[in-house]
Amino acid sequence: MFQGKILEYDNDGIVCHDTDDRLIWNQSYEMTAPELSVCEQYLAVYDRGGTFIYIMSERGLVKKIETATPIERVCVARQGTVAVLMKEDDVSYVRLYDKKGQELASGEFYQEKGSFPVDIALAPDAQKLAVDMLDVTKGKTCSTVTFYNFGSVGQNEIDNNVGTYSYKNTMISELVYTESGKLLAISDAGLIWFDGAQKPAPKKQIKFEREIQSVFYNNKYVGISYSDTKKENSWHIKVYDMNGKTVMENDTEIAYNRIELLDNNEICVRDDYNCELFTIHSIRKFRYTFDRQLYNVLSGSDGQNYTLVSVSYTHLRAH
């Protein structure tokens, strides 16, 4: 979903239409591995391993950017600014561009120094950038999260670095900035929350006690699921708020291929034909087996209506 609209994208282009299937805009391109980054009124669609970025708004194309180096990751901020992680040979590059394509900041990382960037996250105001570095030179993994501040506070620091935090025997695979400005780091060992308007610092850490099957999140919550050792063919779901407090727990017997938080903050668990919905208060709200393959589930604004997108037909309203 993007501004209440439905997005469809593939290697040839991206289409935005409303829930009544009316076309809003259509942008064509040629990409091998298109991926999306969304923040409020802007989205960036980019070619992972390619060199093209399309910054889009609810009205359509804002700017097309071509990079000189293959792209690994793009993050967009609420005003359309994008942070771009690129890599070529043993050198990684980070560039910051405004929505007109003008370069705002840049940096380089050399793998010969022992570590390399795994992920980046751009704060919604585009003033802070977090970089996740992985070091495996000594036979053990060590992840480091470094924060850069491009505002007045960061100008007083060397290379705009306002904080660096290392975690031994840990591999942080993903960084996520929420709309409130908190950063979530997802690792093989657990979840770490960082907070701070100018100089973010660790505020909460939860260690995983067993092997995690899935981690899913939105701007308000982050959830995990793992196999229930007490029940065969059952998975336990646990959801935390962005302060690290447990807010929801329940079990599902669907051998799902998709688990996610919907726009109304309900948890949707589904495979190709089965769908289950839980409220954020742990109540199982809905379960059904469909005779057509499910493509997507979208929540309405009132918490009662849903759009179920199937292969054969597009819209079905369910209460």
Q: Where is each model-derived feature located?
A:
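Repeated scaffold domains used in trafficking and secretory/extracellular systems
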Residues: 1, 31-38, 69-77, 114-121, ...
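Conserved small/polar residues in nucleotide/adenosyl-binding loops
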Residues: 314-319
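Short beta-strand elements that form the blades of beta-propeller/WD-repeat-like
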Residues: 2-9, 41-47, 80-87, 127-133, ...
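Solenoidal tandem-repeat scaffolds enriched in leucines and small polar residues
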Residues: 93-170, 174-178, 183-184
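Short, solvent-exposed loop/turn segments at conserved positions within beta-propeller repeat blades
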Residues: 87-90, 137-143, 230-234
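Non-cytosolic head/periplasmic domains of membrane-anchored proteins
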Residues: 26-124
